[in-house]
């Protein structure tokens, strides 16, 4: 049945994608590709608490001041005076309430005996009066009494037009506490019930659409709105009343990706303020909704039904988190307990966690999956104030404790001016850790103490031992199915196996336990456009994290991931009992045949399984499939009613008479059927199927609710491959083990791409978009999945299954059972179609070599004429007939080509010759070439020839690996591109195999020759939208003349992300298609991640226009752009600049061997091998000819359509129309109306970029003070010294000065030419990219990203004079210091946060303690840590060396030893160098810790542990060997490379 029918009475309809009424007035509803549900936000959060609970007005004022100092973490939209939201939560100010309510004639009882509510209401007095009366009636029905109402005075003069136009009326209500409610929480529970009832009864078009209860409590009060941080105190003048007293203030500044008004999405919420994003939200909501049917609570009693639905599904992720936390708290758990359930530590592989605590987390994982994602959450109930950080430590949180009992925590240090002598401690929140101030006890309760009290409340370990069963504990049945060799080929055909899948996908999984790696992009048709029957999985594309939240690093940060999961029936979340964990524990969701046999045999009081066939009669077509599904659902209902708590769906009995129901259809259909029935959590779903075999299949099945999967035919296929010699040197058992390992790691990687760390949280999360499925199929079987172009219905799905079945069971001799060739991954005759076929490649190469436009037209015709064979969405579009104009009236080719770019292809992935040819070609035509993420040889910046050519790439890319990103590199850019994602592998980092890291590549990348490089999946300085704004600001400081470009990949919601990018002041946003090329990527990503650019581009343009942001930003697109027609359609959909990658490479000679990752390119393009590079025959003129032909064809189209300029074309979707009479058996159901939608906005709204972004550099410390101060050094190299104050709002200090020095002095200046001494708390990115000759000395503390991209400068940080705390035990600098630093020195007297020296490739530094993930991905430099490190030190470290002063002798337990060895210090020269570094540290910082180490140096030496990358050590030894053999310089390095690169399979130790 459809989503909206037959719902269990306690399970609200959450399948409907949109709510009937948008929560924000004036905000647009769903239209075209825009959907308000895709909005994201991020922010700054902070609190101040008087630890002893003493109330004062000072706390409120300091909270407001803190808010103003977090202004740069919020945002404004198209109006500078309309904020995204800000607010403050305080304790109920009794003195003020008594005074102000008394003036209204309202008698207020004693504190705690009444509640206060701040409520948004309608500006219409009549609607407001009706709403108040309804509220009063409901309160009375619940046995409580309203004491009265008052209007809250507001001042809206400072607000922008948008905020005023949607402004609610602010009102306050008072409710008396009845005598019967003696317990404080009983009163809060009743207020919760009232709030839920009144929301449902009042918030509607009939009464009051503005109605929203910001807070209703006897303890806390919230003032917030669609305000800037400074406007909070202005809008609510009563906040400045001296009687407005509190012992705590929780504040929040919001940054939304949209500009649409939303008063209620501002924070704080009732219990939390949140900085970050919950990545698992879809799954969390699905499971919370599914659990509601089982909710019972002795504390709520009959009121339980009144508070449902618990979750506001139209709210933001923060709203929903607050909803769930509130329920768990009010249903009986303490607030810290509820937080531990929702945001658990990464406990399963924690080497030092107690068994008692692990038992707590394991027990609660049986009740609820983690709410996972980057999060710093502050929480309060008015009596305690706490904060917790996500398991990955992805948001910053710093705190001060003062000697006069104040606790100040915020996203940054320095948000309030505190005299150094008042500070008792400076600290930070740590990953997964909790921080709690209990005002009743008057103290800070440490993480260990809080959690120990909670984990010891029940004997969780005993409960688990008695009830939770592992697969290993289950008895082994005797009969386990094996391989049926005789029918294997026929069954493979029935499930659509191809020979290509065996060879390319399954072989590396079975042989090596790894996913298959491929290269180039996907140029085959979408599943809905293919002539061939496709598996249903292929209609689903993986979504991924970009900008608003980061992907997770499942390789280097494996310690925070988990594949463990449970299956079975859940209990009541609100009434935990020993038997609540009566489940079966799985180490991986991929089951062997033996595992499944154990589950099938279960039949007792604890566990009962039932196996249901998922088969249908192929002769009955669609009706047969529909009937079989309905019968399956009925059988499942019956099984559950008879006590089954495990349902196994099986297609093992497939036969000539019975075809297999597509497994995904059966799993997801049943999952959603059971949710609708309210019985989903009573049962676990297991699949036994011959259909799934690759990572994507498993990921989609798990994402749609499957608990475990037995891919029995894949196991049999591995056996068959061994027998046929396709798999060698491995037996069947090992092959199956390897296969499960590859599949499990692959699924974790897919989950990590969206920022999810555990398979448990990924299950049921539905993080996919359907491309080409009809809405009726979505509503019935895949509720709440986006499917924006419609497409195939159930009839087509049935037809595809039947075609496979008929092909397998057609009468033929047994020896004619041969698998289809495939052709998905490489072009094959009779295989799947490819846009780049041998014919199109040959024609294009002839055309560009001969300069023959007529040959190009033949090539373009083959690509463009997709009437018979559809490939792409643009192939389904036609131009409407319009009055043409003469060709000479169209803007010239030269003007058009200035809009052309080549895509980001790194020096390393392609050869020097190919890379430079593209740069020369694009510079000739006035376009732009892109360095890619591998940096650029500085020699190219000034190279020229007699023709005036230049090899300097106009676009310098900044990717997560920061390879080659220096002050000089950035200074030579016309455009700097931040690579957030790549079309071929969004959510993953770039990858360069070790055999391609030749010495000349390693030199440019500042890495080790022969050692593979994998960039981190996230930018470690971009975990949210406000972080991106910071990097944009940093890079603009590093080169004020360059445009800043942000590269995104098309996915649902990319439009709202692009709006956030525009608000973050990017100059250009690039929306790449999923089909873009790559030098190396998992095949799963190449095929199944991301969406066509047509969808992403259209959504981006529509959303930017709706937000009135389109005129502020250039929109670019790329991805399989091959012809002028492609460019024309891109312009009409909203782009004004265009990128090409694969086609220019083909122009230069690429023949699409798709072996770029192997370094064996036969035409010298995708290789570093000198012998193969010699075969390169390309010429810049070939690429010039290609671009000229594209522009020529485009001009012809423009003349045909009557356009004189590109600007006139941008966004003119009214010129496009779907092709008429599409007869394709699948494509005929496609609806492109959403892509062609035109937003209805006024003529004053720009449709292309016309207004330059205001980067606000004129307000920076560099511009206002430092540039003039340092002019003698910049101009003449003279020494400059100065002392200046600094605060947290002074960001990127020194970077503009550094850029000016670099532009004049490429090699920098002599040491200490500029020496600036700052006093205070430095803002983010202090000293970013500063070159040699600059020294920044900071007396105080620093926030995140200190020394980012340091390019030779020196940074010194130490506590203020007068500080009494011990520096080495306090946080002095924030997270991600020295990210991507390439040269220089840094000395920090104190502790630093997480990810210190991530991707350091040349800086020498001394610090006194570091957080988790220190020296991650480091490739060069020296790091000295004179104290403790966090966990996972040296993960991915392939170069440089670290020295750890290991006083406690346990450093080895916190070091990731995958790529490094731990050694003792023995070399006298090395010991001398180390001592000199520490002595420098003491000299610069006066470090007490450094002095202590040096004071007893001989005793200190044995305590140092040297962390040495094994790859790096091997290279050094090889160089030494080469030098001893008489080689020198580059010859020695090349010899070392040849020696080191013999192990060609290694990729950076992975």
UniProtKB/Swiss-Prot annotation:
Its cofactor is [3Fe-4S] cluster; FAD; FMN. Keywords: 3Fe-4S, Amino-acid biosynthesis, FAD, Flavoprotein, FMN, Glutamate biosynthesis, Glutamine amidotransferase, Iron, Iron-sulfur, Metal-binding, Oxidoreductase. Binds 1 [3Fe-4S] cluster. SUPFAM superfamilies: Alpha subunit of glutamate synthase, C-terminal domain, FMN-linked oxidoreductases, N-terminal nucleophile aminohydrolases (Ntn hydrolases). The keyword Membrane does not apply. The active site is at 43 (for gatase activity). GO terms for biological process: ammonia assimilation cycle; glutamate biosynthetic process; L-glutamate biosynthetic process. This is Ferredoxin-dependent glutamate synthase 1. The keyword Transmembrane helix does not apply. InterPro entries: Aldolase_TIM (IPR013785), ET-N_metabolism_enzyme (IPR050711), GATase_2_dom (IPR017932), Glu_synth_asu_C (IPR002489), Glu_synth_asu_C_sf (IPR036485), Glu_synth_centr_N (IPR006982), Glu_synthdom (IPR002932), Ntn_hydrolases_N (IPR029055). Residues 925-948 are annotated as: Disordered.
């Amino acid at each position: 049945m459809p989503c909206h029918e037959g719902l269990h009475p306690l399970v609200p309809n959450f399948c409907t994608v949109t709510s009937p009424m948008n929560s924000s007035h004036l905000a647009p509803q769903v239209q075209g590709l825009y959907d308000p549900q895709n909005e994201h936000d991020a922010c700054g959060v902070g609190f101040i608490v008087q630890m002893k609970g003493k109330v004062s007005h000072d706390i409120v004022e300091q909270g407001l001041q803190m808010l103003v100092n977090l202004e740069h973490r919020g945002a404004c939209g198209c109006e500078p005076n309309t904020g995204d939201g800000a607010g403050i939560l305080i304790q109920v100010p009794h003195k003020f309430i008594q005074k102000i309510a008394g003036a209204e004639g309202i008698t207020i009882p004693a504190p705690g005996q009444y509640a206060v509510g701040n409520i948004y209401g309608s500006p219409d007095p009549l609607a407001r009066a009706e709403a108040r009366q309804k509220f009063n009636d409901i309160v009375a029905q619940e046995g409580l009494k309203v004491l009265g109402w008052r209007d809250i005075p507001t001042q809206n003069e400072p607000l922008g037009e948008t905020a005023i136009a949607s402004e609610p009326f602010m009102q306050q209500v008072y409710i008396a506490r009845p005598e019967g409610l003696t317990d404080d929480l009983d009163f809060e529970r009743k207020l919760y019930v009232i709030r839920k009832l009144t929301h449902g009864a009042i918030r509607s078009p009939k009464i009051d659409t503005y109605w929203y209860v910001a807070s209703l409590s006897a303890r806390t009060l919230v003032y917030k709105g669609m305000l800037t941080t400074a406007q909070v105190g202005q809008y609510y003048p009563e906040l400045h009343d001296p009687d407005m007293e509190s012992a705590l203030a929780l504040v929040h500044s919001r940054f939304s990706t949209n500009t649409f008004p939303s008063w209620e999405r501002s924070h704080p919420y009732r219990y939390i303020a949140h900085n970050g994003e919950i990545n698992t939200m879809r799954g969390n909501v699905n499971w919370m909704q599914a659990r509601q049917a089982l909710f019972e609570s002795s504390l709520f009693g009959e009121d339980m039904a009144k508070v449902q639905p618990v979750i506001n599904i139209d709210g933001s992720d923060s709203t929903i988190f607050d909803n769930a936390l509130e329920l768990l708290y009010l249903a009986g758990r303490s607030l810290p307990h509820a937080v531990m359930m929702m945001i658990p530590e990464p406990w399963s592989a924690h080497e030092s966690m107690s068994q008692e605590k692990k038992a707590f987390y394991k027990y609660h994982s049986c009740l609820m999956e983690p709410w996972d994602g980057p999060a710093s959450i502050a929480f309060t109930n008015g009596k305690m104030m706490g904060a917790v950080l996500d398991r990955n430590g992805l948001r910053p949180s710093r705190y001060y404790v003062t000697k006069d009992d104040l606790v100040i925590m915020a996203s940054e240090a320095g948000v309030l001016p505190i005299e150094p002598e008042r500070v008792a401690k400076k600290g930070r929140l740590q990953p997964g850790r909790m921080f709690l101030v209990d005002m009743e006890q008057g103290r800070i309760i440490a993480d260990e103490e809080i959690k120990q009290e909670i984990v010891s409340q029940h004997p969780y370990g005993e409960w688990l031992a008695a009830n939770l069963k592992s697969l290993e504990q289950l008895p082994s049945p005797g009969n386990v199915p094996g391989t049926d060799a005789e029918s294997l080929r026929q069954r493979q055909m029935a499930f659509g196996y191809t020979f290509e899948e065996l060879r390319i996908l399954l072989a590396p999984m079975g042989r090596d336990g790894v996913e298959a790696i491929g290269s180039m992009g996907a140029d085959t048709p979408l599943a809905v456009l293919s002539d061939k029957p496709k598996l249903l999985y292929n209609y689903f594309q993986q979504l991924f994290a970009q900008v608003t939240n980061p992907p997770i690093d499942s390789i280097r940060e494996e310690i925070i991931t988990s594949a463990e999961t449970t299956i079975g029936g859940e209990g009541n979340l609100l009434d935990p009992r020993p038997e609540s964990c009566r489940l079966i524990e799985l180490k991986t969701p991929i089951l062997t045949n033996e595992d499944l046999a154990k589950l099938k045999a279960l039949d007792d009081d604890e566990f009962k399984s039932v196996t249901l066939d998922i088969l249908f009669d192929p002769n009955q077509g669609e009706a047969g499939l529909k009937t079989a599904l309905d019968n399956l659902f009925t059988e499942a209902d019956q099984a559950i009613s008879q006590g089954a708590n495990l349902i196994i769906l099986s297609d093992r009995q497939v036969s000539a008479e019975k075809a297999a129901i597509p497994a995904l259809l059966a799993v997801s259909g049943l999952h959603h059927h059971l949710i609708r029935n309210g019985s989903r959590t009573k049962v676990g779903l297991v699949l036994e199927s011959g259909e799934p075999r690759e990572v994507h299949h498993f990921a989609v099945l798990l994402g749609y609710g499957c608990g475990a999967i037995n891919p029995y035919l894949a196991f049999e296929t591995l056996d068959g491959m061994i027998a046929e010699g396709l798999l060698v040197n491995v037996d069947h058992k090992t092959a199956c083990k390897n296969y499960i390992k590859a599949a499990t790691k692959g699924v974790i990687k897919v989950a990590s791409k969206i920022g999810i760390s555990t398979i448990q949280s990924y299950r049921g999360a539905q993080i996919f978009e359907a491309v080409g499925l009809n809405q009726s199929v979505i509503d019935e079987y895949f509720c709440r999945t986006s499917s924006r172009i419609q497409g195939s219905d159930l009839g087509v799905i049935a037809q595809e299954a039947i075609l496979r079945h008929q092909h397998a069971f057609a009468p033929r001799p047994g020896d004619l059972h041969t698998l289809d060739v495939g052709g998905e991954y490489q072009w094959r005759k009779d295989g799947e179609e490819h846009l780049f076929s041998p014919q199109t490649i040959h024609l294009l190469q002839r055309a560009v070599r001969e300069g023959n436009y007529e040959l190009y037209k033949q090539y373009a015709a083959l690509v463009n004429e997709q009437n018979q064979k559809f490939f792409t969405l643009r192939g389904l579009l036609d131009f409407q007939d319009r009055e043409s104009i003469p060709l000479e009236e169209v803007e010239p080719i030269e003007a058009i080509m200035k809009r052309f770019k080549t895509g980001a292809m790194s020096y390393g992935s392609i050869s020097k010759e190919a890379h430079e040819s593209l740069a020369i070609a694009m510079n000739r035509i006035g376009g732009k070439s892109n360095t890619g993420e591998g940096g650029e040889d500085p020699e190219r910046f000034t190279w020229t020839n007699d023709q005036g050519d230049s090899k300097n790439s106009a676009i310098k890319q900044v990717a997560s690996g920061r390879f080659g990103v220096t002050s000089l590199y950035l200074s030579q850019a016309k455009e700097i591109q931040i690579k957030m994602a790549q079309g071929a592998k969004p959510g993953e980092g770039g990858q360069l195999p070790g055999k391609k890291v030749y010495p000349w590549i390693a030199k440019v990348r500042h890495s080790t020759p022969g050692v593979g490089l994998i960039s981190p999946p996230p930018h470690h300085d971009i975990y949210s939208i406000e972080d991106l704004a910071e990097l944009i600001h940093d890079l603009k400081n590093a080169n004020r003349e360059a445009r800043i470009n942000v590269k995104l990949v098309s996915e649902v919601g990319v439009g709202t992300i692009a709006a956030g990018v525009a608000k973050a002041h990017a100059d250009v946003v690039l929306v790449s298609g999923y089909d873009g090329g790559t030098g190396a990527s998992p095949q799963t990503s190449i095929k199944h991640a991301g969406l066509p650019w047509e969808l992403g581009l259209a959504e981006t343009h529509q959303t930017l226009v709706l937000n009135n942001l389109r005129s502020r930003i250039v929109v670019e697109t790329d991805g399989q752009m091959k012809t002028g027609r492609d460019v024309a359609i891109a312009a009409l959909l909203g782009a004004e600049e265009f990128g090409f990658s694969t086609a220019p490479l083909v122009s230069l000679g690429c023949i699409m061997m798709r072996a770029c990752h192997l370094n064996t390119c036969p035409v010298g393009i995708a290789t570093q091998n000198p012998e193969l590079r010699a075969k390169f025959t390309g010429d810049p003129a070939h690429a010039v000819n290609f671009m000229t032909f594209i522009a020529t064809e485009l001009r012809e189209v423009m003349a045909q359509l009557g356009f004189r300029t590109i600007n006139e074309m941008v966004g003119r979707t009214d010129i496009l129309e779907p092709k008429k009479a599409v007869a394709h058996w699948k494509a005929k159901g496609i609806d492109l109306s959403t892509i062609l939608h035109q937003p209805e906005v006024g003529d004053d709204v720009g449709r292309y970029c016309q207004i330059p972004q205001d980067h606000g550099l004129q307000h920076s410390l560099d511009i206002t003070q430092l540039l003039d101060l340092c002019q003698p050094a910049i101009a003449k190299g003279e020494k400059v010294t100065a002392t200046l104050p600094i605060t947290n709002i002074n960001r990127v200090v020194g970077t503009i000065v550094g850029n000016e020095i670099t532009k004049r002095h490429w090699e920098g200046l002599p040491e200490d030419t500029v020496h600036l001494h700052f006093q205070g708390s430095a803002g983010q990115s202090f000293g970013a990219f500063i070159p040699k000759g600059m020294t920044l000395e900071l007396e105080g503390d620093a926030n995140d990203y200190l020394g980012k991209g340091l390019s030779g400068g020196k940074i010194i940080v130490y506590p203020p004079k007068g500080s009494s705390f011990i520096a080495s035990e306090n946080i002095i600098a924030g997270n991600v210091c020295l990210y991507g630093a390439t040269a220089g020195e840094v000395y920090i007297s104190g502790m630093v946060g997480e990810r210190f020296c991530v991707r350091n490739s040349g800086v020498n530094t001394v610090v006194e303690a570091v957080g988790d993930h220190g020296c991650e991905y480091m490739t060069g430099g020296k790091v000295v840590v004179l104290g403790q490190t966090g966990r996972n030190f040296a993960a991915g470290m392939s170069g440089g060396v670290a020295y750890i002063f290991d006083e406690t002798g346990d450093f080895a337990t916190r070091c990731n030893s995958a790529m490094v060895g731990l050694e003792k210090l023995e070399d006298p020269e090395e010991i001398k160098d180390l001592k000199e570094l520490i002595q420098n540290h003491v000299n610069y910082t006066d470090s007490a810790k450094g002095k202590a180490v040096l004071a007893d140096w001989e005793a200190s030496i044995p305590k140092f542990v040297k962390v040495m990358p094994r790859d790096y050590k091997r290279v050094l030894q090889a160089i030494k060997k080469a030098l001893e053999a008489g080689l020198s310089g580059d010859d020695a390095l090349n010899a070392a490379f040849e020696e080191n690169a013999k192990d060609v399979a290694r990729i950076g130790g992975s």
